[in-house]
Every structure is written in structure tokens, then in C-alpha cells.
Amino acid sequence: MADLYPSLAQCAIVATAFKILLFPAYKSTDFEVHRNWLAITHSLPVKEWYYEKTSEWTLDYPPFFAAFEWLLSQVAQYADPAMLTVKNLNYDSWQTIYFQRATVIISELVLVFALNRFIKSAPQSNKHLAHISSLSILLSPGLLIIDHIHFQYNGFMYGVLILSIVLARKQSTLLYSGITFAILLCMKHIHLYLSLAYFVYLLRTYCLDPKSVFRPRFGNIFKLGLGVISVFAVAFGPFIYWNQLLQLKDRLFPFSRGLCHAYWAPNIWAMYSFVDRALILLAPRLGLSINEEALTSVTRGLVGDTSFAVLPEVTKEHTFALTFLFQLLPLIKLWRSPGDWDVFVGAITLCGYASFLFGWHVHEKAVLLIIIPFSLIALRDRRYFSAFRSLAIAGHVSLFPLLFTAAEFPIKTVYTVFWLVLFLFVFEQVAPVPERPRIFPIVDRFSLLYLAVAIPLIIYCSLLHQLIFGLERYEFLPLMFMSSYSALGVVGSWIGFMVVYFTA
């Protein structure tokens, strides 16, 4: 790996220096969320962690992440003990800011380690491709925006996910892959959306004989079952003993929230909401009835029960059924391809797509659940890259509304555009020519046109709209345009990758 330049370590050092410069940048309410979790886990006994509600930002991550916060709090007391007081709401001394920002960077070493393992696990002929993909993840504008400005710990947890995926590459480490993924589920439950792909792959490849599903490997079944059950027992056992499992369920799965987040995530429901919004204007001419009570919801994107003015309502059951259906399709191929790692990663990616496109109350940040695993196989050949390109554009541009302050506008825009131009150009140059011809070569032209529209759209939504309409008029339009534009790219990418996946 000495000939791979620049190395992961070199890029990580330069990126760290840049991220340190961002310490004083804008931070979202998620910063206070994690400060409060530091205080809760440090100040209260474990059995009170999921009952504490002094702050509205209650602990709603699984126990292993709470334990991670507890570990951080043991060091935080030396930086500024005041940050660990539960009643010290919205406390953000410089010591607190620097400490919390630094923990994000340090925890990202897990991502660097996982990417290094990914490169080492690649066949010798593909190591340079794995290296390029790894650099694109390490320097991702998504992680920069969400983790190092907005504030979260996604780099750390996606490092655990990548490590689990890499461990699934060899039969000898499949057991550790399943256990690592179980640990990840006990850290952030959004990864449940990927669990069916793991279940099918581990069952077919590790628990059953690849040559016959009627020959179970009882030793492997026992080891995997014992390992996974042990992980969940350690995580949830104490809360079961304290009879707190229902309380954890209410915290981890707050289904009282509406279909759409305040800013529509770029998915099917964003397009559905956009069509509903357009039909409000056309309804009088078309003779359609309008639900007057829903007008506030469709224009403001409130977090409560989302209602539609013209189109039929969407229930939780609808979203669950659609998500399961579109996850089931790639799992059929995965079941029929035991031991095929590329098919496994493709199935993980498509499970991520299905949950993001059809899920209930999806956050725009969840687009990384697609981008990160897809990046690992985006350079398999140019057909994969063609499907990945519009996702990379749409997914990263859709994150811009997270940073709405003027000071961060040039940072997010210049960094993201530079990343897109650099890595999409490099990907285009190095992606191998596929053995089969591309079914829809027009997709490439669509991707280029889609990229060309991104820059003027960003300029309008971030600058021109306020100059034209002011701060009070049509304030929902920029978010609606950005969300709908991004949704078009994500959905187009999903359709393209579905075709590639099933014809590969």
C-alpha cells in the first residue's frame, strides 16, 4: 500500500487540521443534545438514563451509544465540569465546544481504521480503486457538514458499519461481521433498516451450506446466535431486569412524529408532497376538493401529523409495506448468490434506498445510509458509477439546508462542489468498462445535466430568493425546490442501480 498516494493517514491529518478550524462554526441543537446526554450519563444512575426529561432533548439512542457518551463524560469532567450538570441547559462554554468537537474527530479514527481494512481486503488488482473510494468517504462533504459543523457522530458509527461489511468479505470473519453489526444496532437503531440484508447473507453464507439450503451448519448457527444474543443481552439485559423495555421502546421509536420531517428529506414523499402542493393551485380548474386544514402542513412541513390537501393520506402501514417490498426484491438475488460480497453490499445499499425513499419521518441526514455503502462498490464498473453519480450530487446538495447561516454558505458550497468535481472526475477516469453494455447510456447525460442545474439552484435558494421576495414571503419555496430537486436525483439513482443490480 506504500504506492497509494496520498495515503489515508496523510488525508486524515490534513482533514483534521481543516476540521479544527471549524470549531467556532455554527452548531445545531444536536450539540446541546449530546451535551445533555453527557450530563445524563455522568450524573445519573443507569436505570434513570431513559427517564430523565429535564431537557426536551431526552436520551433516545440505544444503550451502547449511551455508554459511549458515559465514556466521553469521564474525560469531559476535566475539560469543564459544568457541562455535565443536567440542569445546565444550552451550556456552551468554549471548553465545552472544543471538547465536543474534538471527540467527533477522535472517534472518526474508527472510520479511518475501517477504510484501511477495506483497502487491505480488496484484491491486489483493485486496491487503487478501493483506495480512491476510501478517500471519497473520508473526505465526504456529508460527514463534514453533519458531523463537524452541524454536530453528530456519524463518522464513528459508519466506521463500525464499514468494518462489519469488510469482515463479511471472507468466510473466516463472517462471524465477527454479524457480531460487529449487532454492536452497531445497539449504538444507533437506524441501521435496523439494513438488518434484513445481513440476516439473509449470514443465513445463506454462514449458517447454511452454500451448495444446499437443506444442510444447516449447526456449529455456525450456534456461534452466531450466541454471539448476537450476548451482544443484545449486554446492551438491553439490565433494562429488561429493571422492567424498562417499554420505556426504551417509546424513546427509541417515537411514532407520534409525522410522515415528513420539517425539511422534506429528498425521497418519494417529498415528491408526493410537491405534487400535492402543485395540485392545490390546479384543484379549482380540475374540480378537485381541497382539505383546508392540511394547507398549513403541506406548505410549512410541520413535524406533527402530516396531512395532504388533495392527494390521499399516507399512513405508517403504507410506508412499512412499501419499505419491506422494495427491500425484499434485492434480498431474493442475495439469497441466490451465497458468498457474493458485491451482491451483499448492493443489497445493503438497496435496503438503505428503500428505507430512505419510503420510510416514515425520514431525516435528510439518513441519505448517508445509502451513500456510504454504495461508495464501496461504486467503482466496480461504469454502470455502477453512473447510478452513483446522481446520488452523490443529490444526496450532498440536499444537506445544504442544515447549514442556513451566512458564514457557513461558502464553506459548504465550495467544499461540496470541489469534492463533486474532483471525485466524480476521478471516478469517471478509473471506473472499469463493464463487460455488458450499459442499458441506458442516456443516464450519463442526465447526470451531467443534473449536476449543471445544481449550482444555479443553490445560488437561488441561498441568495436570490431572499433578494427577490424578502425574508417573510414564500419562505417555504427554497426548501421545497431543494428537496424536490434532490428527490429527483435520489429516485433516479435508485432506479438506475436497481437495473444494474439485477442485470449484473
UniProtKB/Swiss-Prot annotation:
Membrane topology for this entry?
A: Multi-pass membrane protein
Q: What's its EC?
A: 2.4.1.265
Topological domains on the Cytoplasmic side lie at: 25-95, 150, 204-220, 283-342, 412-413, 472-479
Any idea what this protein is called?
A: Dolichyl pyrophosphate Glc1Man9GlcNAc2 alpha-1,3-glucosyltransferase
Spans traversing the lipid bilayer: 4-24, 96-116, 129-149, 151-168, 183-203, 221-241, 262-282, 343-363, 391-411, 414-434, 451-471, 480-500
What subcellular locations does the record give?
Endoplasmic reticulum membrane
UniProt keywords, alphabetically? Endoplasmic reticulum, Glycosyltransferase, Membrane, Transferase, Transmembrane, Transmembrane helix
> What does this protein do, in the record's words?
Dolichyl pyrophosphate Glc1Man9GlcNAc2 alpha-1,3-glucosyltransferase that operates in the biosynthetic pathway of dolichol-linked oligosaccharides, the glycan precursors employed in protein asparagine (N)-glycosylation. The assembly of dolichol-linked oligosaccharides begins on the cytosolic side of the endoplasmic reticulum membrane and finishes in its lumen. The sequential addition of sugars to dolichol pyrophosphate produces dolichol-linked oligosaccharides containing fourteen sugars, including two GlcNAcs, nine mannoses and three glucoses.
Xref: InterPro entries: Glyco_trans_ALG6/ALG8 (IPR004856)
Show which residues sit on the Lumenal side of the membrane. 1-3, 117-128, 169-182, 242-261, 364-390, 435-450, 501-504
Q: Which Pfam families match?
A: Alg6_Alg8 (PF03155)
Q: Return the similarity comment.
A: Belongs to the ALG6/ALG8 glucosyltransferase family.
Q: Which GO terms describe its cellular component?
A: endoplasmic reticulum membrane
**Single GO MF descriptor:** dolichyl pyrophosphate Glc1Man9GlcNAc2 alpha-1,3-glucosyltransferase activity
Catalytic activity line of the entry: an alpha-D-Glc-(1->3)-alpha-D-Man-(1->2)-alpha-D-Man-(1->2)-alpha-D-Man-(1->3)-[alpha-D-Man-(1->2)-alpha-D-Man-(1->3)-[alpha-D-Man-(1->2)-alpha-D-Man-(1->6)]-alpha-D-Man-(1->6)]-beta-D-Man-(1->4)-beta-D-GlcNAc-(1->4)-alpha-D-GlcNAc-diphospho-di-trans,poly-cis-dolichol + a di-trans,poly-cis-dolichyl beta-D-glucosyl phosphate = an alpha-D-Glc-(1->3)-alpha-D-Glc-(1->3)-alpha-D-Man-(1->2)-alpha-D-Man-(1->2)-alpha-D-Man-(1->3)-[alpha-D-Man-(1->2)-alpha-D-Man-(1->3)-[alpha-D-Man-(1->2)-alpha-D-Man-(1->6)]-alpha-D-Man-(1->6)]-beta-D-Man-(1->4)-beta-D-GlcNAc-(1->4)-alpha-D-GlcNAc-diphospho-di-trans,poly-cis-dolichol + a di-trans,poly-cis-dolichyl phosphate + H(+)
Q: Which GO terms describe its biological process?
A: dolichol-linked oligosaccharide biosynthetic process; protein N-linked glycosylation
Give the record's pathway.
Protein modification; protein glycosylation
